[in-house]
């Protein structure tokens, strides 16, 4: 990783200025060359160091400033937070989450979120947040103004993504629970040598609650390894997806039969997750643990 970071820095932007300073000084006044070398290499080292990619997440709470906000629907938005330097990355492994801290009436509250962005995105990170009237942290997000800050610590989580974890991922996401799924989907589909197939059951209340649908549909249309099926509680007329909740029957109809080569990934509201824990056991999958491990057949984020 250190070697890759080093090679990713455009060294020609260091060598050329250093050479010009030394050569120019030599032409004008040779006795100053020693000083010029010191100055040139100091400037070159500073330029090189500033150009390196730096991971900023740590176990200590850091403050990040809101730089942009994109409202998706009546209660959901994407919040973009600025990293200290334009070349910085968050340093969050795929499928893991960070802990967010906010102040509400003088009291600190926290909640975990998986960013939409990845370490391919430099200088910022994006959080997809659905705000609830009684949610201390999520409601605070809806009140944030550009320039406001949140506290962040991480990374957290037991998912350590790599090629070959399973032959088939059966994903079940509810609402903003799409975020870790989308990170994994992007990672798999961006690797043309990864044979993993993915089936996503994405559940929401209404059609307007389906966030990032354009991207999800585009990925499914582009790559045969990925299939998506939508589920709505309150569907519109002529709805072609499923209606109601994600049930045993729905899982059985869309996912492969339980096997060592299949993993079921779940992320969503607590009642939905609890129901799916029972449904997967009834279908023959191994019982999920309270805190999932990477080797589990059913992994709950």
Curated annotation (Swiss-Prot):
Cofactor(s) needed by this chain: FAD
GO CC terms, sorted: mitochondrial outer membrane
Compartment(s) of residence: Mitochondrion outer membrane
Residues annotated for FAD binding in this entry: 142-157, 168-199
Listed SUPFAM superfamilies: Ferredoxin reductase-like, C-terminal NADP-linked domain, Riboflavin synthase domain-like
Transmembrane intervals: 8-28, 32-49
Annotated pathway: Protein modification; peptidyl-diphthamide biosynthesis
Protein name as it appears in the record: NADH-cytochrome b5 reductase 1
Organism, as annotated: Schizosaccharomyces pombe (strain 972 / ATCC 24843)
